[in-house]
Amino acid sequence: MVRSFPPARVDRIIVHQFDPARPSPGGIDSCIRGILRYLPDGLDVAVLGVDTGFSQSGRRVGQWEEHRLANGRNFWFLPVASLDPANQTRRVPHSLRLMLGILRYRRKVPMTNVVQVHRMDSALAVRVLVGKPLAYFIHTQEDGLTGRTSDSIWRFAARAHRRLESFVVRRAKSVVVFNEAYSKFIRKLNPKAIFSPTWFDPLLIKRESASRDKFKILWVGRFEIPKDPVLAVETFNRLVQMDPGSPWSLDMVGSGTLLEHVRNEVNSLPPHTAERIRLLGRVPPEDVAAAMAQSSVFLMTSHQGYEGFPRVLVESMASGLPSVVTAGSDTGGLVDEGITGFVSSRRPDELAEKLTKSVSLDRDQVRNSVTRLDAPRLVTRILDLDHTELTAVGGS
């Protein structure tokens, strides 16, 4: 990172509570990192984001930075507010603080051809503050933010969210929906909308590890209600009861408001079970990839109706992990029953039984089932919507 100024005009501005210095839990952060890593040559991109407090010394809010990646690509970054997106106990919504920061530093924002946004409320504000065409990204199912298991404030105003999102979609230059079912509805509002699966970053994925543990289960996600980390603990407890002779273990990666609750749940288990569960907290993507390389099976316990196209499932399968998922969480239909994993009800005993079956599945078949979902290919397709003239968009 060096202090620098972007050109007077850039091709694209990305707006989100994003900090290149520290990854945050969730698919949006990973999406933005993938886009920045695989930018086409010659595309100038600036990011209006936040300072999480973990950057290199010398950073100042309101001061531009130039970030150069190992592959030679670069982008500009302007932190406009100080906040940690992973802190879900905030009193003031993160999106509001981000917009207030953009308002404060709007004179420093360059001209642009398109503004990329990942939230409906941010999109509404950006239309006023920046006044440029929108590239709107939707990461959830139709009622993903407003359903009963959502942790979004919009669950209290579902009708308003639906109307406002329709307003944004109709006026966007491009719309990318990471959920195939919802994309069909969105395309009725804006014919330019496309469906895109999420992707894995081939530079992060580790094919195999000499230390891969046949009995290690991995769970990755935010410790929030939609992801239901408590169910993972309950499932593991049942697994140990069903198969006490095998050295099963569970690594849980992530953080959130339920972390202490989960810790208490673990501590309440019998000691010989609790000692096999590790709560690893918030770790960078490289460490998540290493954990996937060392594990044997991936467990996903999200509630039905929330996930758009779960990126962590794509990443785990690209790492060769058979996956056991709760019904409704694999919205991309990636899990081929008995071949690449298993779909289960939310009953801990059924989840546990399918975990025992998953360790015998062929890792190469799992890995090969998602090879088409690599970041370089899908990022290029998405950016082509706004930055090249296309006669057709395949797979839409």
What function would you assign to each model-found segment?
Residues 181, 199:
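Carbohydrate-associated surface elements
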Residues 103, 107, 142, 155-175:
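Membrane-proximal helix-turn-helix segments that form the acceptor-binding/catalytic region
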Residues 263-286:
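Nucleotide-activated donor-binding/catalytic signature segment of Leloir-type glycosyltransferases, i.e.
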Residues 322-326:
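Short hydrophobic beta-strand element within catalytic cores of glycosyltransferases
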Residues 336-348, 355-360:
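Conserved acidic donor-binding segment of nucleotide-sugar-dependent glycosyltransferases
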Residues 114-116, 128-148, 175-176, 194, ...:
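Active-site proximal beta-strand in glycosyltransferases
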Residues 30-34, 215, 222-241, 257-260, ...:
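A conserved mid-protein helix/loop that constitutes part of the nucleotide-sugar donor-binding site
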Residues 293-307, 321:
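Acidic donor-binding loop of glycosyltransferase active sites
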